[in-house]
């Protein structure tokens, strides 16, 4: 019996051994156990990169002198003074799309799109030309195109709202305001002025505002702003005050020798804006909140870019923002820079 039990026990052990495939090994590799951490601080480092230019070559060899521009988010309108036209580019790719002009009269110094219409300040031709924004057809003009009858002289700057058109030129020391509801786009001329907004002793063509330079006006928030870059002067009026009080709309004037703004661009955020300005003798492209801009608080921009050994910035540039890209006028070319970020992270274990 005992012999049989021993044989049965040995058989069971052999059967169990044949079923157990587990191998036992000594593991010597290092084991890393992830340790939870917290991000304490993210320090953004924004910079300009990815430069792109457009020149006369992109226009088929036609002259390019980018005096001013306007971006509606889909199309970029460029006042091409040398080309005597407005050139239209795709705002995202900067591919050339089409041109519009009224013969040789479109000596474009500025351009502004609002609603169905495009307004073009036609320089020494003493008129603001009005085009159909979609078809490019010339419709009419503000002024008469001849001195002294025209209420518009050598034009350097134009801006518009759904109700009004604002014009700065060399005729008077004021901004001429035209009522869009009173315009007759089937007429040759529209010469009736709705209001005149005083700009002190400043006018385009004066020693502080040479005719050959570029200027900007824009409606930001509820107000119209006009910039005199050489003196650091900013004029502003509330648009509703202009409609209600016309010539007597209250004026706000600020002057700064430290911050001299030349142009401003809206962004995709109604509470943020980019400006081109002169600070400490250097051109800066800076982003500000609406509140800081309205308060003329330019000391602490949200983001700021200056020229360096990689980035060259034009001295009198007009700026347009397009989805984290900055488009700049630069004489015989358009420049575009991408805004990029290389953030740094400060972390610690939990």
Predicted segments with their positions:
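Short loop/turn segments that connect beta-strands within beta-propeller blades
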Residues: 89-94, 132-136, 179-183, 238-243, ...
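Short coil/turn segments that connect the beta-strands within blades of beta-propeller domains
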Residues: 73-74, 115-117, 162-164, 221-223, ...
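Blade-level signature of beta-propeller repeat domains, shared across WD40, Kelch, NHL, RCC1
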Residues: 311-350
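Conserved beta-strand positions in repeat-built beta-propeller and related beta-rich domains
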Residues: 78-83, 120-126, 167-171, 226-231, ...
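Repeated scaffold domains used in trafficking and secretory/extracellular systems
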Residues: 63-68, 106-112, 150-158, 208-219, ...
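Beta-strand-rich domains and repeat architectures in extracellular enzymes and scaffolds
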Residues: 55-84, 106
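Surface-exposed loop and turn segments in beta-propeller and other repeat-based domains
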Residues: 32-61, 100-104, 140-150, 187-210, ...
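C-terminal motif of bacterial Sec signal peptides marking the signal peptidase cleavage site
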Residues: 15-18
């Amino acid at each position: 019996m005992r012999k049989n039990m021993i044989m049965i026990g040995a058989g069971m052990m052999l059967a169990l051994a044949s079923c157990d495939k587990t191998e036992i090994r000594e593991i010597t590799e290092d084991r890393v156990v992830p340790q939870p951490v917290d991000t304490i601080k993210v320090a953004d480092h924004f910079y300009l990169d990815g430069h792109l230019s457009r020149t006369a070559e992109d226009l088929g060899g036609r002259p390019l002198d980018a005096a001013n521009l306007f971006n509606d988010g889909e199309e970029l309108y460029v006042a091409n003074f040398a080309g005597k036209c407005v050139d239209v580019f795709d705002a995202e790719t900067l591919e050339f799309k089409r041109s519009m002009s009224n013969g040789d009269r479109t000596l474009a110094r500025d351009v502004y799109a609002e609603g169905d219409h495009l307004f073009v300040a036609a320089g020494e031709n003493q008129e603001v030309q009005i085009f159909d924004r979609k078809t490019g057809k010339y419709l009419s003009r503000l002024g008469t195109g001849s001195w002294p009858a025209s209420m518009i002289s050598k034009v350097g700057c134009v801006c518009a709202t759904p109700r009004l058109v604002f014009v700065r030129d060399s005729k008077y020391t004021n901004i001429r305001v035209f009522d869009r509801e009173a315009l007759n786009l089937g007429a040759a001329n529209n010469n009736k002025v709705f209001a005149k907004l005083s700009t002190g002793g400043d006018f385009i063509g004066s020693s502080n505002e040479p005719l050959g330079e570029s200027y900007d006006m824009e409606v930001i928030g509820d107000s119209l702003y006009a910039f005199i870059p050489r003196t650091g002067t900013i004029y502003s009026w509330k648009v509703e005050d202009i409609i209600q009080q016309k010539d007597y709309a209250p004026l706000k004037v600020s002057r700064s020798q430290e911050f001299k703004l030349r142009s401003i661009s809206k962004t995709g955020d109604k509470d943020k804006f980019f400006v081109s300005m002169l600070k400490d003798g250097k051109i800066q492209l800076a982003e500000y909140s609406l509140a800081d801009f309205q308060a003329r608080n330019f000391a602490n921009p949200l983001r700021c870019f200056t020229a360096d050994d990689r980035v060259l910035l034009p001295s009198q540039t007009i700026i347009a923002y397009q989805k984290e890209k900055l488009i700049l006028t630069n004489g015989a070319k358009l420049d575009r820079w991408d805004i990029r970020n290389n953030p740094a992270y400060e972390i610690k274990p939990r």
